[in-house]
Amino acid sequence: MKLAVRDKIIQRNPCNSITNIKLEEIEREYLNFEEIKQLSETIPITENAKEVARMFLFGCFTGLSFANLVTLTFKQIEGDTVKFFREKTKTWHHVPLNETALSLVGDTAKCDPQDRIFSVPKHRQCSYILEKWGKEAGIKKHLHMHLSRHTFATLSLTSGADLYTVSKLIGHKKLATTQIYAKVIDEKKRRAVNNLPRLEI
């Protein structure tokens, strides 16, 4: 519009009177440890659903995206570390695996290094399975694959990891992206304090 005024196409910029619109931040949902435990105790019976559940839980303890999880092979597991390429940032990442994540992978020695760790259906079917599993487990939140990533970031921060470390673990290029999770935690803390009973003094 400024260029149009400069080039005398229009006389006045109609946007001059418009103030900047601040978009309201959407609070990122995540699962707390009790909810993860709840899910782990109600693993689905069918093979497809079991695999989706295993992949989702692995995501909760590694922060890997759906794209990285579905293509993850056994050769990417190097001891207690998972190595993956993040297409979005065009960089390689190494994420340490804790005991829970390692148990979800299973015995890599007995597997073909080229095989995929998770044999899951297409994204839409995975979403359906997750939604159904969440309802059956009594989880009030909407289960989707990206929720596992939010969960990993938030649980890492609440467990004492600093922002820089978490941003490196989940492959964020900008620290500001990871700060969204820290803000969620701060707001939850503030709400918890505000909900304490009031004492009249």
Language-model features, listed with the residues they occupy:
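Short basic/aromatic active-site micro-motif
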Residues: E51-V52, P121-H123, K140-G160
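Short, polar N-cap/turn motifs at the start of nucleic acid-interacting alpha helices
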Residues: Q76-T81, K140-K141, A161-I180, E187, ...
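Conserved tyrosine-mediated DNA breakage-rejoining catalytic core shared by Y-recombinases
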Residues: S17-E25, E29-E35, T62, T71-G106
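Catalytic-site neighborhood detector that most strongly recognizes the C-terminal catalytic loop/helix
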Residues: R86-K90, L102, H123, I170, ...
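C-terminal secondary-structure termini that scaffold catalytic or DNA-interacting sites
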Residues: D107, V120, P197-I201
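Basic, Lys/Arg- and aromatic-enriched nucleic-acid-binding interface segment
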Residues: R6, I10-F66
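C-terminal catalytic core of Y-nucleophile DNA break-rejoin enzymes
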Residues: E87-G106, D112-K132
